[in-house]
Amino acid sequence: MNPQIRNPMKAMYPGTFYFQFKNLWEANDRNETWLCFTVEGIKRRSVVSWKTGVFRNQVDSETHCHAERCFLSWFCDDILSPNTNYQVTWYTSWSPCPECAGEVAEFLARHSNVNLTIFTARLYYFQDTDYQEGLRSLSQEGVAVKIMDYKDFKYCWENFVYNDDEPFKPWKGLKYNFRFLKRRLQEILE
């Protein structure tokens, strides 16, 4: 798809995780989307491969690519096979913009062998109807879109962060913000 797209990173640093994934309603100065992923390749009901990694937006003179597009480019070029079913799970710092949501929905419509679940820390411009429609288009294409809760943040910390065996430390307001964002997402997807 795009030869300038970098391969996924193995993990991120703790400060990056706490800054980028904090589930605030309004998250000023968080201008990047980080996407942690797992890909399970399934043949005859058995997991035959397992990939994990981290993408972030690539914004430079050569490439302007949101994290979702980076993932799709890598996945199509390096992983995707018509003879394998895939369960893909994303943990994102922001929900997709309308353009990325549309591209992902179109990709899934063309590849019935790929199932996607998205856990997101925050909803991007959730008051904007275009962004709401993007989330609905994903849901209509069979994507389970969910708000990250404590166990999801902990999972990301344990699997996608260079954590030096330190435990995940939840921030003040995590549970309250989760409830608020979950209600907003339910309203959008109704």
UniProtKB/Swiss-Prot annotation:
GO terms for biological process: cytidine deamination; cytidine to uridine editing; defense response to virus; DNA cytosine deamination; innate immune response; negative regulation of single stranded viral RNA replication via double stranded DNA intermediate; positive regulation of gene expression via chromosomal CpG island demethylation; transposable element silencing. Its EC number is 3.5.4.38. CDD domains: cytidine_deaminase. It is found in: Nucleus; Cytoplasm. It is an enzyme of class 3 (hydrolase). Residues 29-138 form the CMP/dCMP-type deaminase domain. GO terms for cellular component: cytoplasm; nucleus; P-body. It comes from the Eukaryota. Zn(2+) binds at H66, C97, C100. It catalyses: a 2'-deoxycytidine in single-stranded DNA + H2O + H(+) = a 2'-deoxyuridine in single-stranded DNA + NH4(+). Keywords: Antiviral defense, Cytoplasm, Hydrolase, Immunity, Innate immunity, Metal-binding, Nucleus, Zinc. One of its GO terms (molecular function) is cytidine deaminase activity. Its cofactor is Zn(2+). InterPro entries: APOBEC/CMP_deaminase_Zn-bd, APOBEC_Cyt_Deaminase, CMP_dCMP_dom, Cytidine_deaminase-like. Belongs to the cytidine and deoxycytidylate deaminase family. Homodimer. Interacts with TRIB3. DNA deaminase (cytidine deaminase) which acts as an inhibitor of retrovirus replication and retrotransposon mobility via deaminase-dependent and -independent mechanisms. May also play a role in the epigenetic regulation of gene expression through the process of active DNA demethylation. This is DNA dC->dU-editing enzyme APOBEC-3C. It comes from Gorilla gorilla gorilla (Western lowland gorilla).
